[in-house]
């Protein structure tokens, strides 16, 4: 007797994956459960969006449910059927009969959130398949793209899917939803007791926080100064203050200074011990050693500071490493880059202006993607040295066009004593806000304690005009 042809296991696998992952039963249970119990809506809306439903008719039904909830209308068999009829899509979803079937086949809504999780998980699998296909296509036909760019795009797309496990409402939003969340945030802030007005990450400097309301999520913040003004010191102080005030990590990319030197500066700053003594290890007395030990213990207890001192980093390197720390630690409070001009973008290496533009653009995109403030240090042009008033302005930023455009906040550091030996403002630094997208420009004065590698609040402030 002739043997039957055998089906290869690979053919079976192909047949199994030809239909994208989905669960019709789970989708039906979610929709039927909502009709039975509207009180579960908020939990459902946090887990799934209309596009998570594989079946087209289910997407239409869920979309109409969203409209009804937005209008504070109950969702039941009658109201949903009438709403679908008024939009002319009742026949497309199967009419009243199909809605009744959904309702009748769902005995209760006890497990509705578990069903919603199934719908979302299947949607994520479909997204992974789609992304995987695009990655494969780009790999087969790279079209001259650098391998790092292909890897970065692949990582970005997969990372975006992972993020959607907690935020499934990306894409265009109706302004009604945005208004509700905005008013809710304003209401929460208005009810806080002893609220300082800081809505972002505190800078640690009272008057600077008053001007900026802190360093805001998704903002690109540029800190610029001529050499010897304390640019890196100020940046590290921002990192220290953010790390001490927040539980989420601070990530520092130090392209100029080794990690040990960064830590020496931070220890000197927080312990208020002369940084020369720390750097040389000489003449430290018992009190100073105790201060150092206390700061070390504080860092170990917080355990929320990461330093990457790799040199020559590209935007791809910074993005991938930031995403990893973000993912492994459940978020970030701030990212610091010291400094922008030491980064490189190989694809634009023939044109420095375009290279800086790409670096600046990528840092802004990273801030928006991770919803954290990204602080980047920048150099200033030497031409300001030729002016009588050497206080920096936005046009003094080296390769300034793209940096000025991408930045949400630009801060310059100016210390008059660097230029004038007889300055009346010895030990005083001006933080000049040259641009603030959502706030005023102006100046803030801080105390500069160079021996401790730190800036401090200035007890007595002189009045400065904010017309700078």
Curated annotation (Swiss-Prot):
SMART domains per UniProt: AAA
Catalytic activity: Couples ATP hydrolysis with the unwinding of duplex DNA at the replication fork by translocating in the 5'-3' direction. This creates two antiparallel DNA single strands (ssDNA). The leading ssDNA polymer is the template for DNA polymerase III holoenzyme which synthesizes a continuous strand; ATP + H2O = ADP + phosphate + H(+)
Domain SF4 helicase, first and last residues per copy: 194-462
UniProt entry keywords in alphabetical sequence: ATP-binding, DNA replication, DNA-binding, Helicase, Hydrolase, Isomerase, Nucleotide-binding, Primosome
Nucleotide-binding recorded as keyword: yes
E.C. number(s) listed in UniProt: 5.6.2.3
Region (Disordered) location: 1-22
Pfam family, one: DnaB
Any single GO CC term annotated in Swiss-Prot or TrEMBL for this entry: cytosol
GO biological process, one term: DNA replication, synthesis of primer
A GO term for molecular function: ATP hydrolysis activity
Secretion signal, residue range per the UniProt entry: none
Binding-site residues for ATP, renumbered to this chain: 225-232
Function description: The main replicative DNA helicase, it participates in initiation and elongation during chromosome replication. Travels ahead of the DNA replisome, separating dsDNA into templates for DNA synthesis. A processive ATP-dependent 5'-3' DNA helicase it has DNA-dependent ATPase activity.
Subunit (UniProt): Homohexamer.
Family: Belongs to the helicase family. DnaB subfamily.
Identification of the protein by name: Replicative DNA helicase DnaB
Taxonomic classification: Bacteria, Pseudomonadati, Pseudomonadota, Gammaproteobacteria, Pasteurellales
């Amino acid at each position: 007797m002739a043997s039957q042809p055998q089906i290869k296991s690979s053919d079976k696998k192909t047949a199994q994956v030809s239909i994208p992952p989905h669960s019709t039963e789970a989708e039906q249970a979610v929709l039927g459960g909502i009709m039975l119990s509207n009180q579960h809506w908020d939990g459902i809306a946090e887990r799934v969006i209309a596009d998570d439903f594989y079946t087209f008719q289910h997407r239409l039904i869920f979309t109409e449910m969203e409209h009804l909830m937005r209008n504070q209308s109950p969702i039941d068999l009658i109201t949903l059927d009438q709403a679908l009829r008024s939009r002319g899509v009742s026949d497309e979803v199967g009419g009243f009969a199909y809605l009744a079937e959904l309702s009748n086949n769902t005995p209760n809504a006890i497990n509705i959130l578990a069903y919603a999780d199934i719908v979302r998980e299947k949607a994520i699998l479909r997204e992974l398949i789609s992304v995987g296909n695009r990655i494969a296509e780009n790999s087969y036909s790279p079209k001259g793209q650098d391998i790092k760019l292909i890897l970065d795009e692949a990582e970005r797309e997969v990372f975006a899917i992972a993020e959607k496990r907690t935020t499934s409402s990306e894409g265009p939003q109706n302004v009604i939803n945005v208004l509700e969340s905005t008013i809710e945030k304003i209401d929460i802030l208005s009810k806080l007791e002893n609220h300082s007005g800081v809505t972002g990450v505190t800078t640690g400097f009272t008057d600077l926080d008053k001007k900026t309301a802190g360093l805001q999520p998704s903002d690109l913040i540029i800190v610029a100064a001529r050499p010897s003004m304390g640019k890196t010191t100020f940046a590290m102080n921002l990192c220290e203050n953010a790390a001490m005030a927040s539980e989420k990590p601070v990530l520092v990319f130090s392209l100029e200074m080794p990690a040990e030197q960064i830590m020496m500066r931070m220890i000197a700053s927080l312990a208020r011990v002369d940084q020369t003594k720390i750097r040389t290890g000489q003449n430290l007395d018992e009190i100073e050693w105790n201060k150092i030990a206390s700061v070390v213990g504080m860092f170990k207890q917080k355990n929320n500071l990461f330093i990457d001192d790799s040199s020559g980093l590209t935007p791809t390197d910074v993005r991938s490493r930031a995403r990893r720390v973000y993912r492994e630690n459940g978020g970030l409070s701030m990212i610091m880059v010291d400094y922008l001009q030491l980064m490189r973008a190989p694809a634009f290496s023939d044109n420095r202006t375009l290279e800086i533009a790409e670096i600046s653009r990528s840092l802004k995109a990273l801030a928006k993607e991770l919803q954290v403030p990204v602080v980047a240090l920048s150099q200033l042009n030497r031409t300001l040295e030729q002016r009588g008033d050497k206080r920096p302005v936005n046009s003094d930023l080296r390769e300034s066009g793209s940096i000025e455009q991408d930045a949400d906040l630009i801060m310059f550091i100016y210390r008059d004593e660097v230029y004038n030996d007889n300055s009346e403002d010895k030990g005083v630094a001006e933080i000049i806000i040259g641009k603030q997208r959502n706030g005023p420009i102006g100046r803030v004065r801080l105390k500069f304690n160079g021996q401790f590698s730190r800036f401090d609040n200035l007890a007595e402030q002189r009045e400065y005009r904010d017309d700078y």
